[in-house]
From Swiss-Prot:
Belongs to the binding-protein-dependent transport system permease family. HisMQ subfamily. InterPro entries: AA_ABC_transptr_permease_3TM, ArtM/GltK/GlnP/TcyL/YhdX-like, MetI-like, MetI-like_sf. It is found in: Cell membrane. Residues 16-217 form the ABC transmembrane type-1 domain. Part of the ABC transporter complex GluABCD involved in glutamate uptake. Probably responsible for the translocation of the substrate across the membrane. This is Glutamate transport system permease protein GluC. Keywords: Amino-acid transport, Cell membrane, Membrane, Transmembrane, Transmembrane helix, Transport. The chain crosses the membrane at residues 16-36, 64-84, 100-120, 195-215.
């Protein structure tokens, strides 16, 4: 046990810090892209609705591993897209990290868009009709009336998406991002006799990340719920 902790201890917090960074950056990007996709999905412009619907349906039915591998092998290795300076001594690690974030954003934004659309469905259509009768355009109605109420109604689905994103960050290990699951894999390889102990350590680590998130978002949803 002491040997396990001597090998694992110094790397455990840095690995989970990478997991947290992946989650935060991906969540911010997913909210931005997901909001854009939602606006397109409910837009009066047919071509925008079609593009958004096609994107969401395609991504939601594509395995996340394929999306991450596409970003690494397709965008970087085949098309030469780099998201870090080649002169940097940490180029490969930084580039893989940012490609993973890009993949998580592309994937998770589809689920964010669906969560927001479920929130929009709770907003009474009469509010939009009243706003149109006052001369407001779609962008003003969406920004000022529909979207704020949709977010309040969609906190629980958005929270579930965020928790799923936190757990999905383990997929980043397939392109060599040094997050928690990659450390777990290497630790198991070196300490196969401590398999269940290693699993327990990392399970507790992810519970520490996700349980407070779920409880906090649940409280926020109760606080912001529309009183009827």
């Amino acid at each position: 046990m002491s040997t396990l902790w001597a090998d694992l201890g110094p790397s455990l917090l840095p690995a989970f810090w990478v997991t947290i960074q992946l989650t935060v950056y991906s969540a911010i990007g997913s909210m931005i892209l997901g909001t854009i996709l939602t606006a397109m999905r409910v837009s009066p412009v047919k071509i925008l609705r079609s593009i958004s619907t096609a994107y969401i349906n395609t991504v939601r039915n594509t395995p996340l591993t394929l999306v991450i591998l596409f970003c690494s092998f397709g965008l970087y290795q085949n098309l030469g897209l780099t998201l870090a300076g080649r002169d940097s001594s940490t180029f490969l690690a930084d580039n893989n990290f940012r490609l993973a974030v890009l993949g998580f954003i592309l994937y998770t934004s589809a689920f964010v868009a669906e969560s927001l659309r479920s929130g929009i469905n709770t907003v009474h259509f009469g509010q939009a009709e009243a706003a149109r009768s006052l001369g407001l355009g779609f962008s003003d109605i969406f920004r000022s009336i529909i979207f704020p109420q949709a977010v309040r109604a969609a906190i629980i689905p958005l929270g579930n998406t965020l928790i799923a994103l936190t757990k999905n960050t383990t997929i980043a290990s397939v392109i060599g991002v040094g997050e928690a699951s990659l450390l777990m894999k290497s630790t198991i390889e070196n300490h196969a006799n401590m398999l269940f102990v290693v699993f327990a350590i990392f399970a507790v680590g992810f519970m520490i990340l996700t349980l407070p998130m779920g409880l906090g978002l649940g409280k926020l949803a109760e606080k912001m719920a529309v009183k009827k």
